[in-house]
């Protein structure tokens, strides 16, 4: 049995402030650090350990992974960081309050920007200081590959080649893999793994810091998927994520 574990980063400062974050590099809150430690304890309790982990270029995911590995005494394992696991780029929405944006443009429009399959927010201007090509962490990435906004469809196109060429072969070889990333980058992977439709993906909400386990047979057929933790508590957290723009 092969196990893939997905963890959305712990609560970030902009999660707490209910701001669109995207590729903005914000830190974890104290609560986010606690969520990461709790995720590690849940994995230990289940007896799930790793030799390889993957994360994004953004510190909220990197620090969540570091805490998990430290608590599990797995600081020595191989860690691969890639910009391809970054959050969906929210374009000109980055830094705006979700409720205030909903009040201005309507909840339906904001829901489309947040959760729909192929609707992207307004793009950043190329000259905007927030544009990824102005950030030195992306200096080795071709400029034409760096987004100024993204839909979930765009995010999937960015992530899935890396899944197929890099992550999936490691999972096949090692049987367990950990990915610590972001709500929409993980939704992209989940849509692929579960064959979720473009319409149904709108309703998938991932709470911060909760391990989501996928089990596969030796032929990489999906056998089961489940969250670790209290079912009712996780359901309430998912509902809270869904209501962020209300």
Curated annotation (Swiss-Prot):
Indicate whether Phosphoprotein appears among the record's keywords. Answer: no
The chemistry this enzyme catalyses reads: (2R)-2-phosphoglycerate = (2R)-3-phosphoglycerate
- List residues binding substrate: 8-15, 21-22, 60, 87-90, 98, 114-115, 183-184
Active site per database record: 9 (tele-phosphohistidine intermediate), 87 (proton donor/acceptor)
- Residues under site feature: Transition state stabilizer: 182
Residue ranges crossing the lipid bilayer per the database entry: none
Q: Which processes are annotated in GO (biological process)?
A: gluconeogenesis; glycolytic process
Question: Mind telling me which CDD domains this protein's record contains?
Answer: HP_PGM_like (cd07067)
Pathway assignment: Carbohydrate degradation; glycolysis; pyruvate from D-glyceraldehyde 3-phosphate: step 3/5
Is Magnesium included in the keywords of this UniProt record? no
GO MF terms listed in the record are: phosphoglycerate mutase activity
Keywords (alphabetical) are:
Gluconeogenesis, Glycolysis, Isomerase
Listed EC numbers: 5.4.2.11
- Give the NCBIfam families listed for this entry: pgm_1 (TIGR01258), PRK14115.1 (NF010713)
Assembly and partners?
A: Homodimer.
User: What is the documented function of this protein?
Assistant: Catalyzes the interconversion of 2-phosphoglycerate and 3-phosphoglycerate.
Give the family this protein belongs to, as stated in its UniProt record: Belongs to the phosphoglycerate mutase family. BPG-dependent PGAM subfamily.
* Descriptive protein name: 2,3-bisphosphoglycerate-dependent phosphoglycerate mutase
Source species taxonomy: Bacteria, Pseudomonadati, Pseudomonadota, Gammaproteobacteria, Cardiobacteriales
Underlying gene: gpmA
């Amino acid at each position: 049995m092969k196990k893939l574990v997905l963890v959305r980063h712990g609560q970030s400062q902009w999660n707490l402030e209910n701001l669109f974050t995207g590729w903005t590099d914000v830190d974890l809150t104290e609560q986010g650090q606690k969520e990461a430690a709790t995720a590690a304890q849940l994995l230990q309790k289940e007896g799930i350990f790793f030799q390889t982990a993957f994360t994004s270029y953004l510190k909220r995911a990197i620090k969540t992974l570091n805490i998990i590995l430290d608590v599990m005494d797995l600081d020595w394992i191989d860690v691969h960081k890639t910009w391809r696991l970054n959050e969906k780029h929210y374009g000109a929405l980055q830094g705006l309050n979700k409720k205030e944006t909903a009040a201005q443009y309507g909840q339906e429009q904001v829901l489309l920007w947040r959760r729909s399959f192929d609707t992207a927010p307004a793009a950043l201007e190329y000259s905007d200081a927030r544009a990824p090509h102005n950030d030195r962490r992306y200096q080795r990435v071709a400029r034409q590959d760096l987004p100024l906004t993204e839909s979930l469809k765009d995010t999937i196109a960015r992530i899935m080649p890396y899944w197929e060429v890099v992550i999936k072969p490691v999972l096949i070889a090692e049987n367990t893999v950990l990915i610590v990333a972001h709500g929409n980058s993980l939704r992209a992977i989940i849509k692929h793994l579960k064959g979720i439709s473009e319409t149904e993906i709108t309703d998938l909400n991932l709470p911060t810091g909760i391990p989501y386990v996928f089990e596969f047979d030796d032929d990489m057929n999906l056998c089961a998927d489940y969250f670790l933790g209290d079912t009712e508590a996780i359901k309430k957290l998912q509902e809270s994520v869904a209501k962020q723009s209300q």
